[in-house]
Amino acid sequence: MSNETNSSNFIKNIIINDLETGKHDSIITRFPPEPNGYLHIGHAKSICLNFGLAKEFNGKANLRFDDTNPLKEDVEYVESIKEDVKWLGFDWNELNFASNYFDEMYKRALILIKKGKAYVCDLTQEEMREYRGTLTEPGKESPHRNRTIEENLDLFERMKNGEFKDGEKTLRAKIDMSSPNINLRDPIIYRISHSTHHNTGDKWCIYPMYAFAHPIEDAIEGITHSICTLEFEDQRPLYDWFVKECEMENIPRQIEFARLNINNTVMSKRKLKQLVDEGIVDGWDDPRVPTISGIRRKGYTAEALRNFCSEIGVSKVNSTVDSQMLDYFLRENLQPKAPLTMGVLRPLKLIITNYPEDKIEMLEIENNAKDESQGKRLVPFSRELYIEQDDFMEEPVKKYFRFFPGNEVRLKGAYFVKCTDVIKDENGNVVEIHGTYDPETKSGSGFTGRKVKSTIHWVDAKSAIPCEFRLFEPLILDDIPENEGKHFLEQINPNSLEILQGFVEPTQIKDAKPFDKFQFVRNGFFSIDNKYTTDEKFVFNRIVPLKSSFKPGK
């Protein structure tokens, strides 16, 4: 699958032109998350794009934390973001914090005030909204808009010195209250917040707004191409205004691309936080949420995620990607290397009545059905086995060829076995089935005397390792979860997690560790959970089923 199609990557074309015309000798990009939550798969697209472009064009990429809001940020998120970037396979040129530039930002704000381009305003947030106007009506000027430069300098310094309460005053850019672009109607540059910052402590009680801080940070770092998502397109004129009016030496270019949306998936950080806070999911790393921590715990590989992000490419048009596309890339990634093993998720005991009670036979079974070079393993086989409950049906429906009374099937890598008896409990539930095997039908023996229509997997009851299986379905029922007509909590799937107690064959997993991946015969690709697996018990997360109707390019 080619990575060069990628919507003909218009950002690459911009970079190529900038390098060929000599506008830049080299490029510097950045990934600038706010450390107020865990990164999700949408951020993975941005990480792959920014770091990938820097690598492709022999440039540099910085990791910068836009930590300008002390009320929402935490060191926990800083560390998780660093881990996510590293896990995806990238490293940064510089590790920066917006808060390290607070002194410089303050100086640039003073430049605006001295040029008559910024003023201290006393309007409340509610009053400011009333003055701002609408998309069809111009705004009204603040009564404080024409304060003198001297008065503004004095008030701004007093804001910095902590003389005013939170929300009592703001510093605003003085642009155009009648602009058709609402972002240019005197946006706030600084607000007062008497809060302890995770990096600067209590040094500051005024903090820059993102729209002001971001272009200043980019210019300070010499970023050549400031790549962001499409919702910032209307803010580009403001971005350019701040770079120009703050007299920045370096002039970065903001470029917007469409964000990643995936069906049945909540991508809003605010909504994800609500799911975590209300205990609907098991933390930020719950395998059902699209955080990078969550999909890593579920068992996704960084390579599959990078391939997915490369294939969807970049565009100027918002769209929703089918989640099965990501699953496709995961299967493609795991199929060649995840060792084949047998696990029974919903066990039903099978007793082979004519097999010797004290006999244990070691059978050779392939490690990868599509790659003989991976060899074979020895799997124990004895009189008592476990099979899947749905591999038996007392009264079979049409075209059901697995176990039913009188029917014969092949046990994978073993023998033909015919169902001879059914054991039920006092409530009529099937708890055990009996059968007989034919010693002449051993796999690999060349037996051709008769054929069966079904092969099923199994585990040996004596040696099988008890374990837990966790199966996941989409957390959100609505195909488009951002549907504004419903509250997203109304779309929660009550059956998004199923926990089963079953068994796995011992050969492949006896020395396994968290995050190891396996292909369970007929059941899917699984990964060992890093949170609930203990020395006493393995917990397996199903990453994806084995098959899907999804085909790339359709």
Curated annotation (Swiss-Prot):
Catalytic reactions on record: tRNA(Gln) + L-glutamine + ATP = L-glutaminyl-tRNA(Gln) + AMP + diphosphate
Cellular-component GO terms for this entry: cytosol
Positions of short motif 'HIGH' region: 33-43
Binding site for L-glutamine: D66, Y210
Gene Ontology terms, MF aspect: ATP binding; glutamine-tRNA ligase activity
Single biological process term from Gene Ontology: glutaminyl-tRNA aminoacylation
Keywords linked to the UniProt accession: Aminoacyl-tRNA synthetase, ATP-binding, Cytoplasm, Ligase, Nucleotide-binding, Protein biosynthesis
Binding site for ATP: 34-36, 40-46, 229, 259-260, 267-269
Domain of life: Bacteria
Pfam families: tRNA-synt_1c, tRNA-synt_1c_C, tRNA-synt_1c_C2
Enzyme superclass (EC): ligase
E.C. number(s) listed in UniProt: 6.1.1.18
InterPro entries for this protein: aa-tRNA-synth_I_CS, Gln-tRNA-synth, Gln/Glu-tRNA_Ligase, Gln_tRNA_ligase_bac, Glu/Gln-tRNA-synth, Glu/Gln-tRNA-synth_Ib_cat-dom, Glu/Gln-tRNA-synth_Ib_codon-bd, Glu_tRNA_lig_a-bdl
Subcellular location(s) of the protein: Cytoplasm
Residue window of motif 'KMSKS' region: 266-270
Subunit composition and interactions: Monomer.
Entry's family note: Belongs to the class-I aminoacyl-tRNA synthetase family.
HAMAP family found in the cross-reference section: Gln_tRNA_synth (MF_00126)
Protein name as annotated: Glutamine--tRNA ligase
Lineage: Bacteria, Bacillati, Bacillota, Clostridia, Peptostreptococcales
